């Protein structure tokens, strides 16, 4: 399985430019839809464009399943923006896109997860509730994540405005295998393991 998990994609995406250049990218902004600040979504769009990617944007909370399936099947790369992890995970599970995504990743496609998009890869997303408020209309009975990895990404570590909350999560969830990364770091996962990469 190929994953690139990060806090801020436009700051580190060039580290994997060979994986993105001239490729078909399914761009999923769903996590950001209820957020006040979404500048990172526009920054990501610009970087994909600069790298010559062919981007198809799709909101999994409103699109028909067959449309999502078609976009995912045509994509080389599936990218999830940051935003609210609980809202994103709820939509993935509610629509069946979670299983569709796993099928496509089994074919060797690359998933890029930024912030919320990285958090959802863990076995559970419960650890992030202090950073991401759970929506009132959250419809799942548990806080299961996609369970693609056996660790828990903690994005924006010691980075404003998340300095205090990330420190708190590190302390309170010390029993979890947390992987803290700042906005200049990313985690590359392939069949052989994972490594943290850094943008100077």
Regions found by a protein language model. Give the residues of each.
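Short, active-site-adjacent cap segments at secondary-structure transitions
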Residues: 86, 118-121, 186-188
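Class I SAM-dependent methyltransferase SAM-binding "motif I" and its flanking Rossmann-like core
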Residues: 97-159
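Glycine/threonine-rich flexible loop motifs
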Residues: 85-94
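Conserved anion/nucleotide-ligand pocket segment
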Residues: 144-149, 153-191, 197
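Short glycine-rich anion-binding loops that position phosphate/pyrophosphate groups of nucleotides
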Residues: 33, 83-86, 117, 158
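N-terminal beta1-alpha1 cap of cysteine-dependent amidohydrolase-like domains
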Residues: 1-77, 81
């Amino acid at each position: 399985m190929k994953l690139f998990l990060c806090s801020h994609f436009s700051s580190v995406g060039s580290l994997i430019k060979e994986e993105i250049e001239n490729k078909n990218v399914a761009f999923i902004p769903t996590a950001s839809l209820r957020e006040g600040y979404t500048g990172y979504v526009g920054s990501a769009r610009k970087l994909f464009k600069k790298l010559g990617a062919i981007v198809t944007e799709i909101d999994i909370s409103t699109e028909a399943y067959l449309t999502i399936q078609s976009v995912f099947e045509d994509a080389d790369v599936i990218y999830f923006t940051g935003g609210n992890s609980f809202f994103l995970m709820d939509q993935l599970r509610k629509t069946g896109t979670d299983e569709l995504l796993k099928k496509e990743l089994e074919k060797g496609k690359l998933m890029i997860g930024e912030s919320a998009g990285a958090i959802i890869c863990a076995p559970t997303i419960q650890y992030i509730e202090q950073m991401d408020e759970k929506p009132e209309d959250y419809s799942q009975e548990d806080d299961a994540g996609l369970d693609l990895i056996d660790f828990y990404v903690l994005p924006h570590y010691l980075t404003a405005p998340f300095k205090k909350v990330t420190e708190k999560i590190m302390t309170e969830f010390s029993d979890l295998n947390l992987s803290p990364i700042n906005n200049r770091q990313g985690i590359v996962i392939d069949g052989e393991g994972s490594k943290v990469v850094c943008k100077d």
